[in-house]
Every structure is written in C-alpha cells, then in structure tokens.
C-alpha cells in the first residue's frame, strides 16, 4: 500500500503541459460559446431567449474580437438557414446583439448580409433563402432600435426593401409591411426625404396592394403636405376608387384569416374617413354595399371586427347609423345561422370590443345605455340574438345599470317592435308561414328573453349588486308572476304598469320559473354576504312581506291563482310563525326553519293545495321542536299515538325533495342538518325505504315523485319557439325516419302467438287457407275478399293498438324508473348530511346494510344507465369516505353489543358469498367498521382506567373481553380465512385480511395458527403462496410483536421456521406458475423469519433450514442455467442467496465472472463476453497469453511484462493487446496512455511487484488497461493488477478515490485528459462528438 501511495504527488508541470492547459481552457469556452447558437435555433421560446441572454453575457464578460466576429458571422448565416422556423430566432438574437453593442456599425452588418446572400449572384436554389436572409437582416437592424438613428443604414435598408418587394411570390407583402413599420418611427424630416423614393405618384399602384395603400395612409397622416406636393390632391373615397378599396379590403381580410385579427389598413381607412367627414360614405358604399354584397366569411368577420373597433371613435349620430344599418343585421343573421365553432370565435371578440367601449366611458352613463340598448334591439323575429348572460354588463356603472333595467321593464310592458332591428333568415323567408310573422309571437319571444336578462343581471358574479336594482327586479318578477292589477294605487307602483299586449299564460309561466331562479341566486350567490338587505332581513323574507302586503290590498290587486279561505288562513298562520321565529333568530335551527317556511310559503302561489298542507305540517313541527322540553313532548306524542314532530318533518322534506328544484334541494339539506340530532328510528326507516331496491321495484312508493310535466311542456314549447324555423323540415324528416325505423323494429319482433292464432282463425273463416288437395277449388268472390280484408284490417288495427299500448306502458315504466332513481339520489343527500354532521349518532349503525344492499343491487343491475352509475358512485362515496373512514363514530353501543357481533358475523359471511370481489370488499370494510366501533369504546374506557388506577395489561385485556368478544370474532374471521385458503374461487382477497391484521393485531395473533397450518399443509400452491404472503407482511409489523411475550414469540418463529423448512423440500421442482409463485413466497417468508431471528438475536436452531437450502443449491443452479421460468428464476435465485447469507454462507461469484477471470484449459483465450461479439482470427490473437502447462508464477510474470510493455507506444501488431471492442481500439490508436500525460514511456516509473500468491487469479488485459490509464491520467504510477486476494477488493475501491482525493485538481483531471486527446489528434469532429466523449470519460472514472 505504501508503494501505491507514493506516486500520488503530481510532478511539476512542464511548459508543454502549461500550453496544453491554456488551449484546453480556450476550447472549453468555445464549446460553451458554440452551444449558444444551437439553442438559439430551437423551437422553444424560453430556450431561445435564455440562450440569447447567455450569449450576450458571454460576449460582455469576454471582449474578444474573434468571438464577436464569429458570433456575427454565425447569426448572419442563420438568417438564411434551411429551417424556416429558425430564421426569426437568429434575427431576434442579432437584433439584441446590435442593441447591446452599439459600437458595431449597422452598415457593416448590412454589407455582410448582402455579401453573404447576394441578390445578384444567387441561383435558383438559393433564391428563397437569400431573399428571406436580407429581409430578416433588415428587420434585425430595425428591431435593434438603432436603424432610425443611422441615416446611411436607413437609406440602404429602404433601398434593399424596395428591391425585395419585387419578389412577391416568395415574400408576398412583407417588405412593404416592414417599410411601413420603419417609416412610422422615423423623424418627419427623414420621412419627407425617403417618401419620394418609396412611393410613386400613380394611384393605380397605390390601390393595387393593401401594403401600398397602408404606406399611402401613413404618409397622409404624417406628412400630408409632402404627399400633396408629390401626388397632388387625392380623393381616396371618390366613386372611381370605391371598387378598388373594396378589392383591397377583401385581399387584406384574406391575408389575416389565420391570425383572426383586424387588418391595419381597414382601421386606417376608417380613421381617414372620420377625419375627412366621409364616414357615412365609407360605411355604406365600401362596407355595406361593397363587402357585404356577396360576403365571404373572411370579409364578414373583418366587418364585424371593424364594427367593434370603431365603437369608441364614433359620435352619438354615427353610433345610431352603425347600429341600425345593414351590417348590424348581417351580424345578427350570422349569430343565428353560424355553426357553434364559428359562433364561439366571434362572440368573445365582440364582447371584448364592447367591454372596452363600456370601460372607456364609465363617466358617460348615457353612452353606455345607448350601446346596451343597441345590441339588445338586434332581434330575429322578436328574439334578441345576444345571450341573456353577457359579461360586459359588469362594466356598467350604477346609473347606466338602473336606466338599462328601467328600459327592459318598459320594453316588457309595452314592446315597441318598430324600434327593433329585426330580420329573418333566408330559410325563414322561404318558409312563408303566416303564423311566424304575427306580432304576438315576436312579443312572446322578446318578453321571454327580457325576463332571463333581468335575472342574469342579478345572477352575474362580477357585477356589483345595487340593492335598489335587486329590489326593483325582484318586485317586478314577483308581482307579474303571481298577481294582477285591479285598480292602480300609488302605494303599489307596479299597479301603474300597463301592458300594451296582454300577458299570456306562457309568459307568466316563464315569469314563475324565473322568479324561483332569482330566489336561488339570492340564496346562493350572496352567501358570502348572506342574502340580507340593509335592514338585516333575507331577501326571501322581504319578498314574503311584499306578497303579504299585496294580498291585503285585495281591492287593488288580485292573485292569479285565487286562494281559498283555508289557504289564506294557512298564509296568515305562517306570517305569525315567522314573527315567532324572528324573535329567536339567534338560534341556527330557527334560521333554518324560517328559510324553509319562507320558501314553501312562496310556493303557495304556484301550487296552493299542496303548499297549504305542507305549511300546516311544517308549522306544527316547528312549534313542537321549539318547546322547552322535547322529551316530554315525545312522551306526550306517544301517549296520544301521534307521530313525533321530527318524523313529520322528515316526511315533509322527502316530499319537497321529490320536486325537481335545486333551490328546494339545498333548503332541505340545510333544514335536515339542524333536525338530524333529533332523529328517531322511524325517521331513518322513512329515508331508507326510499333507497331500498326491493321496495322500489315491487311496491309503489309512498312519496309521489313529480316531474312538473306542465313546466317541462312549457319549456319544451319555449325551446321550440327559440329554435330556428329553418330546421323544421329536417326535424320532420328525422321524425318520419324514426317512425319508419320503429315500425320496422315492431315488425321484426317475434309475433305474438295469440295474434297468430287469431290471424289463422280469420283466414280459415274466409276460406283463404287452401290445403294440398284443394288446388282446383275456385278463387274467392269479391264479397268474400272484401269481408276478409275488413276482418284482417280490424285484426291488424287491434294488434297495432296493443303494440302501441305496450310501448306506451314501457315508456311510462322507464320514465317512472328514471324519476325514482333521481329521487333516490336526492334522498342520499339526507344520508350524507346525517353521516357527516352526526357520525356518533347510534342510528348510523343501521345504515350499513341498507347502503350495502343499494351498492350490491346497483353493481348487479344490467341496465347501467347514467342515473344508475350516479346512484352507485354516490352511495359508495358516502359509505367508504364518510362512514367507514370517519374519525368519529358511535360510543354508546353497550346495549346492542350482542347484535353488533351478530352483524359482524353476518357481514363477513355475506362478503364470502358474493360473486364479485369488489362487492365483497364493501361488506368486509363494513365488518371492520363495526370492529372499530366495538374496540374504540373499549380503548376509551381502558385509557381512562389506566390513567386513574394504573391497571395492568391483563386487567385491560379482561375488560376488553367483556366488551369485545375476541373468541367470537376470532371464530368468525378464522372461518372466512379458511374459506379463502381452501376454496378454488373465493370473493375474499389477501388485501382484505392484511387490512384486518394491520388494524387489529390481537385478532391477527389469534389467526396466525390458521396461516401456519396452510403453509405446509396439503393445500393448493396458490393458497400456500397466499398464506406465506400474509405471514410475511404481518410478522414484520411492530404492532403484532407487542402482542407477544418473548418466549411466546420465539416459539412462534421456531414453529414457522419448521413449517417453512418442510415446504422447502419441494424447492426447484416447480412445474406451473402457481408452484413457482409458491417457491417465491416461501423464500420471502424464510428471509423474513431469518431477518427476525438475526435482528432480535433469538435462540433458534437454524441447522434444518441450512441443510435443506444447501441440498437445493445444485438444483436451483441447473434451473437457472436451463432458463426455466425465466421471468422469475433470477428472483428466486437471489432470494435463495439472501437466505444463505443470513445463515452465514456467502454467495460465490457467478460462473460467468470466473470464466472471464480464470480461463480454463479447454476454454478459448477470448472471454465469454467477447465471444458474443465474434471470434478473433488466429493471426490477431495475442501469443503466449496462457499456454498449456503454464504455472501460475509464469503466468503472473508474463502479465507483469505485459504491464511494462503497455506503457510503451505500440509499434507492431504482435504486441497489440487482445481485442477490447471497436471503440476501445480507436481510442488506444488515437493516443496511448503515455502520450496523454506528455511523457515518454521511458519516463514512466516502473511498477512494483508485490508478492503473489499462487492461487491469486490474474486480471484480464482489459481490466489491466483500465487501471493503468486511470492511474496515469492522475499522475500516479500504474499499480500492478496482480495483488493478493486479501487486498484486491479494497484496492479496487480505493485506487480511484485516493488518487482523485490527493490530486491538486480532482475535478478537472478528466476534462483535461479529454482536451489533450483532442489537441493531439486534431479531430475535426470534436464539437459534434462532445456527448460521446463525455460518456467515455464517465466510464473511465468508474472503478474497474
């Protein structure tokens, strides 16, 4: 070791080494420098920007002329590269470089660009790259910000762009566009000087291209005097120029169809028209009569964008002209007939334009109102085309919002159809249906839209709610939904509102649905600042007060649906109850009841009969629940045989849930959350009866599920009215096709036997069935044929009616089933509230089996509709997440402990009898939940007792036995475990029992004998593997170890070792996949047992396992070599040697390594690894590597000579080492180890020859060469690869570490070597193979 450490000091660097180090540093910088240009051309924008920043930073920190010249040359070359996507990247990098280094002359750069990509000397192949290189070069000069300051470079650039504009096939209008961008930033004096050179005085040339027109407009804007002196007085909007302007705008629209933006030339023309007071002429002649005469979608969208962009520029009169012209009608028609994908593109753009306009005139409410009214009045046969929910309303100030609501209200009351910008589509015009053009239909469509727009103003999330506006809308909706005016009175402003068209039932029905939508908005959207007005009362309470006031003014107002005396008494009683609840408003329960009472009270105007009964029941329940002594009231209810108030309330909530109202659903959840602490078993049974699959399938429910058919028919009629009439023909065709298909399906069905019999009888009665012998009979007469036809017609008519009745019955049943499933999903809300808010309620335990029945039935159901899936998912989520995994659970289970144990047994048995393992998992988890309930109460008492009295473990176990019957539970789970380990197909799984064992180690302790019995018993291999797996997972658990005393634990480990040893007798004889899995499992179990023995230092006799394993070594080795079960044989072999290592037997080296290190007499000199690559010819083999009869001493001496010779440059083929691969030979040929360090072979210090043991294997020349090179690179003397056995492993690991640690520059040693290699060999592919050389260097660092 001393001899190895002595050469670690590096020798003084020679002058040649110092020069090479400098060149190495320069080369490293060059690599980093050159990598920037590769990253600049990458498609990722962040990578490009990062590379450009690093390049600029590199050039700033290293001001080197050669690198700056190379950078400019490389960037200029990149302007015309073949990859078109990379050209803008190089242009941007060049612009930033010129911006950072202002001392670089722009004219020189421009000259270099024109020299590199000469337009005069370019051939056909280089034409396109050269043109783009010059264009991007000029753009780079302009983007640097220095071009407008350098007059000479500017003139050259303008001239170059003018030349490039002569190649429109490649560059299109990009040169003129670049020229316009440049001239828009130059000073006015320079613009006047450049203008004559770029703009000719011919208007035909200007009106030929949008870019030239844009240049003309720019000149007219900046230097109008110079332009007039150059071209004279020009009227751009003359009659002669109108067609040219239209064509130019069409070309401009097509040029930006992919960018989806407004062309600049269109907006410039608009500004010029406004400046010259020619806006009306431009709008009508150019846009409406020109572009929209035969519009394409590009021209139409350009006009729409121009409309939006012009809004902030127009006056009040001009806005009226624009918003009531042909263009706005074309916009509305496009909104109606466009496909959804196109509609979704234009609506956000128009919304952005309108939002910008409204935001810009916040201080002008009149202008905001004009814009909102203008877009509202764009109608298609009375229906506005804009959506009712429009986000731009958030920009309205309070005054404009108030005025807009007033305008909507007035338009609803007295629709002014003449003020609308109405239109009809082409299909609507062709239909010529008189019923579609009547004013009543247009009024209905307009009023329906206005109602939803009013509600959306309140519903909008981003709108700052003004209480006056909210109250105005709410009062308007409530009054006209449920009341009518008899006589106007100043006390009720709504009575002064008169209708020019009577309010029909359809509009009133829309009003009713919109009113309850408004209630939901006021209840949900304002929850952050609860739905309270300034006086602290909810909006629903204020609306109820308003309704009560209207009912009291029966001389002036009457309700649409007249209330009977009983219904009016129910209303008055509700108002008195509300006052009582208001006095107790501090209680959350009172608030919930108040909310329910208000909502049901408002429903009395919609359905008086039903709401009246519900109101009475609710008030009775509220009064009973608010009594001071609820126990006394319950006993009084029992004595009088009346239902408990909470039961009545649950029935009411279930009936309210049957209504398809989300608002009612939320209110029911809220109210039930307050009454669930008072639930009785009868209440729970009412809810579970709704969920029971058997009850729902076999019996009619007590709760009638309503679907509000009238409302749905109304909504359906509204949808039909809102749809486009041009789709009616296609819909009728589809209906006829569907009818034909259904008739064909009916005919294809199996014929009813009864109908077949009737048909045969009719035919026999008419003598239409002739036998074989009746061929000569005469044909039927006309009267007989007519009678037969009538009989057949009546028979088929009856059959058709029967089929139709069956179909109607089937549809009815499907509809009822759908309503029932929807009702069950809603009823699950109550279960979810109960489980989440009252997890410790004793009634929770009664939910397990009903929920399991729902899950089981839903998973077995064949018709897996969406509702079935929703019901299953919601039930499973409540069961698993809210029930089984709840942190809190019931603690009062003492009286029902016996029933709970029976339920555990029943659940486990049901889990084992399921056909689906996924269903069995739910049953098994339910049993685990019950175990936790039983065990949790025990633990709680045990902890209290432990704290107070310091009871020992045995006493606590006795106490546990009194509460949790461990023997009973053990028998139950033992039977299920036996079922798992004996049945061929069992629904139980291993993870189920692993979960049981991890949660309840005491039960696991009792079940261990069952597992041990099946490890070595006459079980199936798969069952033995399962038993081994469960044992392996559980024995390593710390919780299980605590349950055992030390002698008991040692006895268990000894017993399991004996079982495992007995099973090991069959190791290596696997013939099937199950047997092979058993072998893996038993070895994993054995490793776990041995690890436990070693870790806890148990006194266990390991002789038997060792003997069995040693006897199986040869068989396993043969199995591995033969490749039997190749997917797991290596794993099996590794597990085997892990066990042997824990038994004290080290794993020998593999035969592959031995054959490589110690070649036998019969083996080829080439290693097994190199044999796979091919054999060497005899002439290439190294002589005397190992001859026959060679002694170990001679072999070692010959290899020592080989080490010495390896330090000298190889000259002849006979001295070459054996083949080590193509790449290795190339590296050796390029540079020998002695040349790497800059010294000759004579200067290389001779290695020492330590004493060699005869039994020491010699290293192969490949390993020797790796060792030698690594040591020479670091300046150390190469160590002989022949070492004693005791030092070999330590030497291999230590050689690299010590040399690198003692080297003066440990991290730079290998890069220096790589650089010196490159400098010596002068490889031209240095930069391209950087990654390859880094990989080679990393391999050289590794220890051989």
From Swiss-Prot:
Record-listed Citrulline modification sites: 1322
Protein name per its UniProtKB record: Myb-binding protein 1A
Keyword hit for Cytoplasm: yes
One Pfam family matching this protein: DNA_pol_phi
Gene Ontology biological process terms, A to Z: cellular response to glucose starvation; chromatin remodeling; circadian regulation of gene expression; intrinsic apoptotic signaling pathway by p53 class mediator; negative regulation of DNA-templated transcription; positive regulation of anoikis; positive regulation of transcription by RNA polymerase I; positive regulation of transcription by RNA polymerase II
Annotated region described as Required for nuclear and nucleolar localization, given as residue ranges: 1152-1344
Record motif Nuclear export signal 1, residues: 238-256
Placement of sequence motif Nuclear export signal 2: 261-279
Organism: Mus musculus
Cytoplasm keyword on record: yes
UniProt GO molecular function: E-box binding; transcription corepressor activity; zinc ion binding
Modified residues (Phosphoserine): 1160, 1164, 1187, 1219, 1244, 1253, 1280, 1303, 1318, 1323, 1325, 1329
Modified residues (N-acetylalanine): 2
Record family assignment: Belongs to the MYBBP1A family.
Phylogenetic classification of the source organism: Eukaryota, Metazoa, Chordata, Craniata, Vertebrata
Gene Ontology cellular component list: B-WICH complex; cytoplasm; NLS-dependent protein nuclear import complex; nucleolus; nucleus
Region described as Disordered: spans on this chain: 1-24, 710-751, 1146-1344
Effect of residue 274 to A: Reduced nuclear export
Covalent crosslink: Glycyl lysine isopeptide (Lys-Gly) (interchain with G-Cter in SUMO2): 1149
Comp. bias intervals (Basic and acidic residues): 1148-1159
Regions of compositional bias (Acidic residues) in chain numbering: 732-747
